Amino acid sequence: LYGPESLLALYGNVVPFICSNTRQYPDIFLQRAAALTLCKFMCISAEYCEANLGLLLHLLRTSKDAVVRANAVIGLGDVAVCFGTLVDENSERLYAGLGDKDLGVKKNTLMVLTHLILNGMIKVKGQLGELAKCLEDEEMRVSDLAKLFFSELAAKENAVYNNLPDIISHLSTGEHAVDETTFMNTMRFIFTFIDKERQAENVIEKLCQRFRLTTQERSWRDIAFCLSLLPYRSERSIKKLVDALPFYRDKLYVPDVFQCFSEILGKMHQGKSSSAAAKPSDTDLREFEDVLAHAASQSKQDHALEDATQTQTAKLERRHARPLVSKGQPSRPARTTRQTRRRVT
């Protein structure tokens, strides 16, 4: 592309110019051909790729033609095979295709990301939450592809476990959060891959610590729901949950949170009746049951007292805000006026 006698060099500058000037070259087929040619040229020259990667990403984000966007995604996948470092540095912009309104663009993006991630061509940097959204996509083909991706990813040691905190945060809070029903359905599938007892114990500890970092009831419900999806087969799991009681004690007045912990208690009883080697003891179960009931009762009382205090404080503030003017007492300006009139008379 840069040799003095190279035939392709004649088109090296023409192709980006056409892609960048859609008003001057509005023909849709010309734009599609130029975008494809740009992708192919980028695969044969690192210098050309680095110079025009920004343009290709711009086409993926702003092109009004879904065919151009879909081809740009595939082209980025091919470029990643040739020059993985360049694409890896801009991988977060590739994930944007998962939110495209066009089914073809979304499906191509999901397939390209699946190929690149599973083959280690790009690193996952906290963006698995966007892929997890596809598990509940309305289009069955997208949903099935997402399930296949996570099933293959789970075959890699600790891959899903290591990214679980980021997935939960991405789907539960912030601008990327999904509704609670979608969150629950997604987590039910994701947590099927957390099947090792050691992993479950660590997740229990990490999730419980999140209770103290948020003041939103939605987040409390999401955390409690995730805790209810974990297996509780050993004494260590119960101990982790009991030791973390100070983190969630004051949240148990929320019905959904308490319900999730009640389901956890039911799982513990099931674990006791199973033939697991490290099953929880009767003492552990009674201790957790008593602690849970007492904490829930205390939390309800504290919450009721807090509401009553806030109500009383609001009444006092409104009372002090009223003007203190006696009935029938004239204002100072009026009294001054009458005095002035008497003097004149």
Please tell me what each predicted stretch does.
Residues L1-F17, G129-L135, R141-T345:
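Long internal repeat-built scaffold domains in very large eukaryotic proteins
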Residues A80, V87-S91, Y95-D166, L171-S172:
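Polyanion-binding and phosphate-handling cores
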Residues L1-M121, K196:
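Alpha-solenoid helical repeat scaffolds
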